[in-house]
């Protein structure tokens, strides 16, 4: 049980790190500070990757503990805790509750960050529409360098959507 407690504590700390990184990303999105968005996004991905690795380690550990206790290998952490005596049960349940709350907070932040990013893209589209003149029609005939009338060359466009 000590190994499980240690792993849950590590997982909770990594979940806190993910929440922190998502809050950083939200602050950058809200401030329209695009320079560092790629870095912040990479940091979120790294922290999330570490959390996923720890979740996998926990799943393996829980399956092993379940096997030792004669429980089904597909047992969840909550089901395993029902078979654990005190004081471990309370301590492990408390840690699992904290982890669950952090995961819910992270989900909410991901959704909020997505809305901020969408809003930023719409603002950029609107700005580009005000700054750049509309492209000429494809069939517009202009005078070219030679002094003769020529079809207008297609203009380059800025892609703001992936």
What are these regions (language model features)?
Residues 76-162:
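Short terminal interaction segments
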């Amino acid at each position: 049980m000590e190994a499980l407690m240690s792993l849950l504590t590590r997982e909770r700390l990594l979940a806190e790190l993910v929440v922190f990184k998502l809050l950083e990303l939200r602050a950058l999105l809200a401030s329209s500070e695009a320079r560092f968005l790629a870095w912040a996004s990479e940091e979120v991905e790294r922290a999330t990757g570490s959390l996923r690795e720890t979740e996998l380690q926990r799943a393996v550990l829980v399956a092993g503990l379940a096997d030792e206790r004669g429980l089904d290998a597909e047992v969840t952490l909550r089901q395993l805790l029902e078979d654990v005596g005190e004081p471990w049960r309370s301590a492990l349940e408390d840690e699992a509750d904290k982890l669950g709350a952090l995961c819910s907070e992270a989900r909410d932040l991901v959704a909020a960050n997505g809305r901020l990013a969408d809003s930023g893209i719409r603002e950029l589209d609107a700005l580009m529409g005000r700054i750049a003149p509309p492209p000429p029609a494809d069939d517009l005939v202009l005078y070219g360098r030679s002094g003769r009338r020529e079809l207008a060359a297609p203009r380059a466009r800025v892609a703001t959507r992936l």
